[in-house]
Structure formats: structure tokens, C-alpha cells
Amino acid sequence: MKRIQIISATAAALMLAPLHAQETHSGAAKPAIRQIKIISSAGARALADACSAWAEQNKQTVAIAILDWGGNLVESHAMEGAGANSIDTALLKAKSALRWRRPTSEMNKIVRTGQNLAPTFMHDFPQPGALPIMVDDQMIGAMGVSGADGEKCAQAAIDSVFKASPKPATQ
């Protein structure tokens, strides 16, 4: 019995030791836990409202899907007159922008030119209309918009709510 306890304690210590601190190339310890920013439901609602206002001002009808950093739907909204599949399209676009960490218009160009067809095989939707939501160089979610000028609508909303947070870097 004592032998099993010793083996169990040793195994636990070996498994947990890497979590305490890891060395980086510079020799500094990396923390075992990092803090992340997440979009709140109020923030997501504000994005949807700002995008809807932009669309109305530009005489457009849109549907909007906003995901948190883990891909969970935080907010969705379809303006009156939006097509029956508009929310689904906005959601697919948002998921694609989140997974690839880039605007879906960039993904569309990559697929159309044949540089990378992976997005089409991975059930992504590389059509323009979605952006990653970046705050302080950290992706906190993604916003997909179905309707004309979807990325312009999303960027206007992100700029409005997050006071012109930097656009995601293209790779």
C-alpha cells in the first residue's frame, strides 16, 4: 500500500512540475496561467447595435453573429428583411475568421488564387464578411456579418465599441 502511495505521489509531482514554471529561451520563467480578455454579452450587444446602425445609415440589411474567443455564440441579430439563411451565414463567417485569425476576405483571396484550399476542406466559409475582434493585440472573438459590405459594417462597429482597436495583422 505504501509503495502505491509513493508511486502515486511521484507520478503526480512529475506531472505537475512543468505547470509550476517553464523556462523560455531567454531563461525567464513562463507563468503557468495567463490572463485573457473575453467579450462580454454587453460588449457583443453593443457591437450588434453599432453594426445595425451602420447598416441602416447605409441602407443595407444585415444579420450579425458574434463569437467569444472560444467560438461560443454570444450575440446574434437579424435586421428586418434579412434572408432566412442570413444568421447561419454570419455564424459560419464568424467561425471561419476566428479559426483562421484573419478577415474572411483574406481567406477568400487565398482560396480563389489556389494558394490554400484548406478552408474549403475544413468546413469553413471563406466569404467576405467577418473579422477577428482584436483588443490590445489579443483576439477576444470574431464578428460575422451577412449582407452587403459585411466587413465594413463589422469594422465600423469594432471601431465604435472598442475605440478603433487595431485591425488584425495579415499574415
Over which residues does each language-model region extend?
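Bacterial N-terminal signal peptides that target proteins for export
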Residues: M1-S8
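Bacterial N-terminal signal peptides
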Residues: S8-P18
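Flexible, solvent-exposed loop/hinge segments and secondary-structure transition points
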Residues: Q22-Q171
